[in-house]
Regions:
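Charged low-complexity interaction tracts in eukaryotic proteins
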Residues: 142-158
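Flexible, gly/pro- and Lys/Arg-enriched active-site loops
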Residues: 122, 156-162
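A short, Lys/Arg-enriched interface patch at domain edges and termini
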Residues: 160-177
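Major-groove DNA-recognition helix of helix-turn-helix-type DNA-binding domains
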Residues: 133-136, 140-143
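N-terminal positioning helix adjacent to the helix-turn-helix/winged-helix DNA-binding module
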Residues: 89-93, 126, 165
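Basic nucleic-acid-binding alpha-helical/helix-turn surface characteristic of O6-alkylguanine DNA
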Residues: 1-121, 172-187
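Short, positively charged loop/turn segments that connect secondary-structure elements
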Residues: 117-132
Length: 187
């Protein structure tokens, strides 16, 4: 992957780091206050982090659109995306998610698996594999993996502080009533 240019911004779910290449937005990380995210640290160690010379205009547009999203003024991101770090299956599934599950909507892992089969590459994957792809999504929020839920609850989330962030995002988008408690009984 081409070296990334990084920008950061504050958000209601904590600090975010956005990485861009000349081809598009390639990474979005939830950051610990004052530090790098677990994924960012691991990928920088693998030679995928750093500061490159990607378009400052693209980085600025990504930060602006994320700020608009959190201000309730944007429901869909209109940014070029750099999929070069994704496998064919990841690209297919994440593209289907990006194109078919809108703001305020959810889909189950099984629903997304069925939609991916119907996509242009016709990738057939079990729901569990869809969950793994959601967990490795390089562009959370922009490619809205938080909108993919289990058939019997919220499922997991690897961004930020985990399931609390997913719950907050779904409530923010109106897909989950603020009073609904999805925690397992006895938790």
């Amino acid at each position: 992957m081409t070296e990334l240019a990084w920008g950061t911004l504050s958000s209601p779910v904590g600090p975010l780091a956005v990485g861009c290449t000349p081809a598009g937005v390639a990474r979005l990380y939830f950051r610990a206050p004052g530090g790098a995210s677990r994924r960012e640290t691991a990928q920088a160690g693998a030679g995928q982090g750093g500061t490159g010379q990607a378009s400052t205009g693209l980085l600025s547009a990504a930060r602006d659109q994320l700020a608009e999203y959190f201000a309730g003024q944007r429901r869909h991101f209109d940014l070029p995306l750099d999929w070069s770090g994704c496998s064919r299956a990841q690209h297919q599934v994440l593209s289907v998610l990006y194109d078919s599950v809108g703001y305020g909507e959810t889909a189950t892992y099984g629903d997304l698996a069925q939609r991916a089969v119907a996509g242009p590459d016709g990738i057939s994957l079990p729901a569990r594999a869809i969950g793994r792809i959601m967990g490795s999504n390089p562009l959370p929020l922009i490619v809205p993996c938080h909108r993919v839920v289990a058939g019997n609850g919220l499922g997991g989330y690897s961004g930020g502080t985990g399931i609390e962030i997913k719950r907050w995002l779904l409530i923010f988008e109106g897909a989950l009533p603020a009073t609904l408690d999805w925690s397992p009984a006895g938790a």
